[in-house]
Amino acid sequence: MKDLFKIYSNYQPAGDQPTAIASLIDGLESGLAKQTLLGVTGSGKTFTIAHVIQAMKRPTLIMAPNKTLAAQLYGEFKAFFPDNAVEYFVSYYDYYQPEAYVPASDTFIEKDASINEHIEQMRLSATKALIERKDAIIVATVSAIYGLGDPDSYLRMLLHLSRGEQSDQRKILKRLAEMQYTRTNLSLERGQFRVNGDVIDIFPADSEKEAIRIELFDDEVDNIARFDPLTGEILQRLPRVTIFPKTHYVTPRERILETVEKVKVELQERLAELNAQNKLVEAQRLEQRTCFDIEMMLELGYCSGIENYSRYLSNREAGEAPPTLFDYLPPEALLIIDESHVTVPQIGGMYRGDRARKETLVNYGFRLPSALDNRPLRFEEFEERSPQTIYISATPGPYEQEHSDNVAEQVVRPTGLIDPEVEIRPVKTQVDDLMSEIRQVIAQGSRILVTTLTKRMAEDLTEYLSEHGIKVRYLHSDVDTVERMEIIRDLRLGEFDVLVGINLLREGLDMPEVALVAILDADKEGFLRSERSLIQTIGRAARNVKGRAILYADNITGSMQRALTETERRREKQKAFNLKHGITPKGINKSVEDILEGAYIGKRKTMVAEQAPRYTHWSPQELAKQINALEKQMYAHAQNMEFELAAKIRDEYLLLKEQLMKI
């Protein structure tokens, strides 16, 4: 346990970090249930939490309000703890349309979803780490409070194999089928197995690149090895191995049979109710849909929408909370909630929205009443299941303020940077004044963020700035997570200088190049111009030594005054600390990395990483010779079932043919 977690960093805690770390550790050791880390933007809150995790030596779940921040945190913790199990648990849907019914137009919308296989693998890897390891750090979104397969059923479905043990091949293959692995005779992919005589190759669902080879001899496990499924190279011999199921929803056969019987009983009760109310169409619809699901479960062990029967599959009573990621956490775990002023209300709102949609489905005969128990946790259930918790925010919400037993303040930054200077200027000339400020900041080689109140205003401002020769982009709500991170990355790289948005430029975005934040119509009181929103938005310029914020307003609202007072209080404390310790503020030099590396696999990144070689200086004869050589390699790889290598060579082959045609 001595070095269970080890931080790799060139820096030591500085500024307010040592005090905050000591305060939080003391609170945890004293048994405090809830604490808050009130840390300003750029004060190194992630580094502080990393030191708390290292000191406490406990598995940790970190929750972020969205996939963007979760990916950023995942990258940072992965860098701090390269020797530990840092995992990523977010929704695996690239696209998700839930099942719904609109009575007004008699429209039923089928469930439609596109699952990201890479994220599904990372989710399985996360629960595996919690089961197998004491040094797990799981970075998650609110997806953590949604129903997941029952851990007891999941653990009963594991396949354990040891070298030298007696094991019949047919039993192993049957077990793999029960675990929902599919058999293949071609290239081995995640969640598949392949049989070649007495050799069974398995590509575990939780593994990204490595597969397992089981060699049998006379019904005895003769050898176990990890190997590369692409090249076939043996990487390591193993004394034993545990294969985890392909999905969290895998269920033992006897539980499936019990579920089917309970579903049949509920179906008869519900049909009697609907017929008594003369809802004949609803009764016929429910019977048809449920009988189809029952048949699928009996034949295949699962059905589309099997999560709607999760009450029976996990053997729970009506109304009981569903199993979630929290059920996989050990009792001594820590819970960290990042940007808690956003995440906590988000957790509280999930249950009600889900319930309203499902009640309509139940009332109109699309689902049995037990489907209502396939739901996210209610807020009180989340509180019951939460281990010791630390909330992190620059602007804690009312819940954290009321329930925290200890508040550790982290106002002084390790870099000595002070909060941005805030100016107030009139609304009447805001656009022209902003244009002049933008030109000055661009001349210094820095970037600008501008927030507006409406989508229309953001579009018009973007068009106006663009017409005047300014490189500007508009970040709107339709941009997906990956594209959004690419836009922010391009801003940092200087592909453009000004980013205009509405409510998308607040929490957690790490952009040290931004020297000016402009808030238009700052005196329009409301959600987008509340005290918390203003402090968070002003904070986007806090990572730059020349950081400034301009609020365009004709009146000073209550929210503005409170935000200005808090910013000034922090500035005074930071200046006093710098003066006392002789610190000169330094800007943050942070490399522009793809923070989604490991969390997403994008086409753009692949193209950059795998730029095909150019043969512009070759003669036609040399090109033709190279084309023939590549063609032979391509077919050789294809015959060896090394299709990925064959595809790479094919791309190069086509490129050369194209060049030859141009000569």
From Swiss-Prot:
**Which part of the chain is the UVR domain?**
624-659
Q: Could you confirm whether the keyword DNA repair appears in this record?
A: yes
The organism's superkingdom is given as Bacteria
**Which locations, inside or outside the cell, does it occupy?**
Cytoplasm
GO molecular function per UniProt: ATP binding; ATP hydrolysis activity; DNA binding; excinuclease ABC activity
Q: Which residues form the signal peptide?
A: none
Q: Which GO terms describe its biological process?
A: nucleotide-excision repair; SOS response
User: Where is each Helicase C-terminal domain found?
Assistant: 430-596
Q: Where does ATP bind?
A: G39, V40, T41, G42, S43, G44, K45, T46
Describe the location of the Helicase ATP-binding domain by residue ranges: 26-414
Q: Which Pfam families match?
A: Helicase_C, ResIII, UVR, UvrB, UvrB_inter
Q: Which Gene Ontology cellular component annotation is one that this UniProt entry carries?
A: cytoplasm
Instruction: Return the motif ranges for Beta-hairpin.
Output: 92-115
Which keywords are on file for this protein? ATP-binding, Cytoplasm, DNA damage, DNA excision, DNA repair, Excision nuclease, Nucleotide-binding, SOS response
Q: How does it assemble?
A: Forms a heterotetramer with UvrA during the search for lesions. Interacts with UvrC in an incision complex.
- PANTHER family xref list: UVRABC SYSTEM PROTEIN B
Domain comment from the record reads as follows: The beta-hairpin motif is involved in DNA binding.
Cite the NCBIfam families for this sequence: PRK05298.1 (NF003673), uvrb (TIGR00631)
**So what does this one do?**
The UvrABC repair system catalyzes the recognition and processing of DNA lesions. A damage recognition complex composed of 2 UvrA and 2 UvrB subunits scans DNA for abnormalities. Upon binding of the UvrA(2)B(2) complex to a putative damaged site, the DNA wraps around one UvrB monomer. DNA wrap is dependent on ATP binding by UvrB and probably causes local melting of the DNA helix, facilitating insertion of UvrB beta-hairpin between the DNA strands. Then UvrB probes one DNA strand for the presence of a lesion.
Q: Which family does it belong to?
A: Belongs to the UvrB family.
- What protein am I looking at? UvrABC system protein B
